[in-house]
Amino acid sequence: YGPAGTGKSSLAKAIAQQFGLPLNHFYLSTMDDDDFKRAWENSVTNSPCIILLEDFDNVFNKRTPVNKEQNLNFVTLLNTISGVQDSSGVLLIITTNHIENIDDAIGVYTDKNTSSRPGRIDRIVYLGEMDEMPRKKLINKILKDWPELADDAINETKNFTAAQVQEYCIQKALIKLQEKI
């Protein structure tokens, strides 16, 4: 969990890539109960895999659907992910910008980065603004052709998310490219 642009979805993709697992991205806002159950069963049947439920707080605020036209019921989702069907081989990743909007039945943060509901959500990880070293690496990678911009970028992007750092560097690089034209 964490602010937008911190790399939550990118982390899920990187985990899938690192372990050579398919990433099954469930678009909850477009699913009804049957769609969700069918997609879950298909993923379990074809496991090992990763299921990504992205921006969960955009679909449910606690147990209440955010969109009145939504056809996926929270209880169906809950029963499916913790149901009687063996889900071994499935890594479930849920991302959210607002962990306070996640219902306790899914699992809430404890002081040890674990969940109050192991078996549904086992670990809770916060992704925030970038620390200096990874920020430097990202900046140097994006601005490799303009090292003179890197020092300023490092100083000017404190407390930025990864997406904000990337956008900042791209804008600086575009200015340099336009100067050449």
Predicted regions and their residues:
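Conserved nucleotide-binding/hydrolysis micro-motifs of P-loop NTPases
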Residues: 30-32, 56-59, 97-102, 129-135
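Conserved RecA-like helicase motor-core motifs
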Residues: 22-27, 126
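Walker A/P-loop
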Residues: 1-24, 38-45
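Conserved catalytic/switch belt of AAA+ P-loop NTPases
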Residues: 57-123
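Conserved alpha-helical scaffold flanking the Walker A/P-loop in AAA+ ATPase domains
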Residues: 31-59, 72-84
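C-terminal alpha-helical "lid" subdomain
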Residues: 109-181
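Charged, alpha-helix-enriched surfaces in structured cytosolic catalytic cores
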Residues: 10, 34, 38, 69-72, ...
